[in-house]
Amino acid sequence: AWHLCEVLDLDPKITKRIVFHEITKPAIQAAVLNPRKVDLDLVNAQQARRVLDRLVGFELSELLWRKIKNNLSAGRVQSVAVKLIVEREREIRNFEVTPFFKVSALFKVQDKEGRNYTIKAERPERFDDMAGARAFLESCKKAAFTIKTIEVKPLRRKPAAPFTTSTLQQEASRKLGFSVSRTMVTAQRLYEQGLITYMRTDSTSLSATAIQQITQEITSSFGSQYVEQRTYKSKTANAQEAHEAIRPSYIDRQEVSSIRDEQRLYELIWKRAIASQMADAELEKTIVKIGISTMPQEYLQAEGEIIKFDGFLKVYLESEDEEEEAHDETILPPLTVGQQLDLRKMEAIQRFTRPPARYTEASLVKKLEELGIGRPSTYAPTISKIMETGRGYVIKELREGTERKFEVLTLEQGVIKQHTDKEITGAAKNNLFPTDMGMLVVDFLNKNFEEIMNYSFTAEIEKKFDVIADGKMEWHQMIDSFYHPFHKKLEDTLQNTGRESGKRILGTDPKSGNTVFVRMARFGPVVQIGDTDEVKEEEKPEFANLKAGQSMENISFEQAMELFKLPKTLGNFEDKEVTIGQGRFGPYVKYDEGFISIPRNEDPLSITMERAIELINDKRTADAPVANYKQMPITKGKGRFGPFLKWNDLYVNVSPKYNFDQLDARTAIELVVAKEEKEAKRFINNWEEEKISVQNGRWGPTIFFGKKYFNFPKDKEGNRITAEEAANYKLEEVKAIIEANDPKAFTKKTKVTKAKVSTTNAKSTIAKKPAKKVITIKKKVKA
């Protein structure tokens, strides 16, 4: 609102502003009837946030360019988010796994009608070693098992509050598998269609009207016994409850969109809002202790739950974090104290302590919210920014894990047997991993800007923004108190620190006697043999890229030296050389000027000639045309967005409903024809040589040139032109519209080589740019 006043030259002190949280007729009518003035305290708080974040972002980013690598960035929130991920990764790497043994037993029970049941019980305490577990099983060989106690206690489970921005992001990640940015884009579309309330909010409260509508919906669908009206208070640090919680605009609508993402997210929001006003679920938990005749001090325990009244569970069950252990809920058969049980099998299984779980997008949002870092509107862009390939601080990927053996002792029919089993450990799906660059930047900032990287400092800054919003602090005073010591520290770091490469010495090369070390190079981490000041004149340092899964922090000397065994020539195939190599994007087979990726789970050093030929032939098969259309080949491929077909520079995404590996020629041609027809309808005019086209857009005809869209001028009545009218425009007329919107659109760009800037000049550049912005904004706000 304040920005509109600035642009339109309106006085914010007398200009009225309307507020609505949903795009519905009643909400907008009510807003028009109840206008208010622009809250300049809120404006100042936002200005303070913007200026501070730009100061930190611009100046620290420029420092990183000079000290580490170009195109890196830093920020008050994003750098702390990366730090969380880095610290968790180091915690996992330093975690010492401890083995232990857990005892469980299966008992056969028969009820009065002669029906057989199996109940599972466990020893509450674990054994530290196999000897203790074996001794326990030995004592159970001839034991009688009797029910000692049965404890039944009622439980009540309460529904979760309606969604805030962060809880929606977390739950959509866990239940729907959405990324944070995917959730926000989908929620934005729902909001723009008037289907949900505003999706950037800290509030868990609902309006009286919404509660009334939800109550009516619950009563009509499930009955009045399911209704329990509730009000919720935010548990979030520094919550700003300017809006309602996220809820449907119209509670009686459950089907709203044919677009799958929109419908699924809407259903999630609808169910959560409805459940929030429903009665508690009433459960009954039964705890049974089973005595062991040969060991009176020991017992096994079985637990079960039954739902007496489902309440809100009829609609919605909140999911759990990966970090929280899930507990099996079983129903126990009718049992009585003193009842004897028939042991079918008892096992003592070796288990291992687990390190803390890596962050997912959902759990990272939860942690940032708990620490009071950032705001609902910043979580999605922050996570997207730290995962951008240009920065390369964090990656989200699937890791297959490693095989681990464990021991199992089994007592069955009075005999104890031991066997070794296998499991996969360390597998990860959609977890966030810090890269070497992420770790290097965090260490550099931690060392030189400890205060900014401190979690409590970032949270305290958020509190100061709230104080400014309450009108109790001048925003420019807060900026001044922060900026001067920060800038002094920045200048000191610029002058007194050298370039940072994360160099770590691993040992000495036995052949040359040169130092072996790992460091960050221009295109990523490398192992280097021989520093520039120690190699002989006729020699050059040797370099090797790290393999996937290796890091600068924990690679060993032996692992580093293995990397120099590549590239390795295997021999000739069809009179052409076959070589195994390691590149920036992983290991590969090089053959006939082509590069074929080696699967991630295969060691490139173990690849034989036979396996290399197999990979070459697989590549040939994959690249072979699946069909021909208009005398041009249709080929298959897989990209970051899934499988696709390519024909004549036209890409066709293949839906999961098709078996891509078994796609036949007829289906491939049908998909290409459908895409071709769709593209033909999209273009009204297309000047390929000029790379200019007129297309049918969502809001009418539009011009596309240079990766930008340009609108046609509206007619005298203010209406958009039709497709027929757009078709009559000549190329020169279209060019004139482009130039009117972008005067430099057809100016040829020339590359300018930048001169190297001295340290002294760098200092003045960093000092002056943000300072100018502060003064400009300060004047605007005071005006």
Language-model features: where?
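Flexible coil/turn residues that form the inter-helical turn or adjacent wing/linker of helix-turn-helix
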Residues: 161, 176, 357
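Phosphate-backbone binding and catalysis cores of DNA-processing enzymes
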Residues: 1-154, 241-308, 465, 469, ...
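Basic, low-complexity terminal or inter-domain segments flanking catalytic cores
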Residues: 5, 61, 92-94, 133, ...
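Pre-Walker A segment
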Residues: 140-161, 166, 172, 342, ...
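Eukaryotic nuclear/nucleolar intrinsically disordered, charge-dense low-complexity regions
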Residues: 193-196
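A conserved hydrophobic secondary-structure block that centers on an alpha-helix together
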Residues: 169-171, 175-183
